Amino acid sequence: MSNWLKLEGDVCAVTGALGGMGAEICREFARNGANVVMLDLDEEKVKAAAADLAAEFGIHAEGYKMNATDEAEVQAAVDATIANFGRVDVLVNTAGILRFAAMEDLPLSDWEQVLNVNLTGYFITSQRFGREMIKAGQGRLVHISTVASHSPETFSGVYSSTKAGVNMMSKMLAAEWGPYGVRSNCVEPCFVKTPMSANFYADPEVEKSRSRLIATRRIGEVSDIANAVMFLASKRSDFTTGDAIKVDGGFSNMMGDLTAKPGGRRAYADNFLKNKGVELWSDESGVAKPSDQ
C-alpha cells in the first residue's frame, strides 16, 4: 500500500461500481487504503463485491443499490454513507450507457434514456453527495467523460453530446463549489478494454487496427483510467479543478496522421517507422496508401 496519494482513510463513493472501470477504480482506492462506497443497480452483487473488497484489503467497504437517475435512491445512498462512515470525501461518476444510431433515425426514447443516465444521473449524484462535501468544507468529484466529447464519434447517437455536457457541468461545479473547498474534474478515456468491450476486441484484427491509431500503439486498460482518477481524487491535485485529463495514449494528438499527406511525406514516414520496427498505419485504419496520395 502506498500513501503518496494521501488517500488512506478517505471515504470514496463510486457509481457504476460493478462495471469494468468502476470496479477497478474501487480496487485502486482500496489498494491505497481508502474506504469505499460501491453504488450500482444490483443490490445483491454490489453488497457481495463490497464484502470481498473489504476482506481483501482490510478496509471498510459498503455496497448500496442506487439508480443514479432516481433522486430518492441517490439520497438514500448518501444518507447510508453518512450514517456508516460519517462523511464522504470523494465521488467518482462512472455509470454510463451508449445507443448506436444515426441522428436522423435516433428514437427520442433513446435520446432521453442516454441523456438521463449519462448527464442527469451525474448531476443528481454530484448535487446530493456534493451537499455533504460543502457542509464539510472539502471534497473531490471526478467524472468519467470521453475524448469523444470534443470530437464526436458518428452514429453514436447522443453519447458525445451527453459527455460534452458532463464536461461543462464539471466546470460549473468547480466554479461554484471551489470557495467551499470542493473540486470537480473529468477523466477522458479513448479506446479501453472493459468487460463491455471484450467481444469487440476479441477479434485481434480490430485491436491491431485500432492500436495503430494511438501514439502508444496499444488499447487502454481500466487500470490506466483508475490511475488518473486516483490523482484527481487525491490531495496531490488540490490546485486542479474544472479541468480534464485525457487518458487516450496520445490518440488526440494523432489527427494529422489520419489525413493524406502530399508528395512523398507518407512514404517517408512509413519507411522511417518500418526501419524502426514500429507498427505502420494500416488500410483498416482508413488511411490511404502512399500510392493513393
Pin down the residues of each PLM region.
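Canonical Rossmann dinucleotide-binding motif of NAD(H)/NADP(H)-dependent dehydrogenases/reductases
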Residues: 4-37
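Active-site loop-to-helix junction immediately N-terminal to the catalytic Tyr of the SDR YXXXK motif
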Residues: 98, 106, 152-161, 172, ...
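Substrate-binding pocket helix/loop in short-chain dehydrogenase/reductase
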Residues: 102-103, 110-115, 210
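Active-site helix of classical SDR
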Residues: 126, 162, 170
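Alpha-helical segment proximal to the catalytic Tyr-Lys
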Residues: 131, 175-179, 238
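Residue(s) in the substrate-gating loop at a strand-loop-helix junction
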Residues: 146
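C-terminal helical subdomain
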Residues: 186, 208-240, 247-249, 276-293
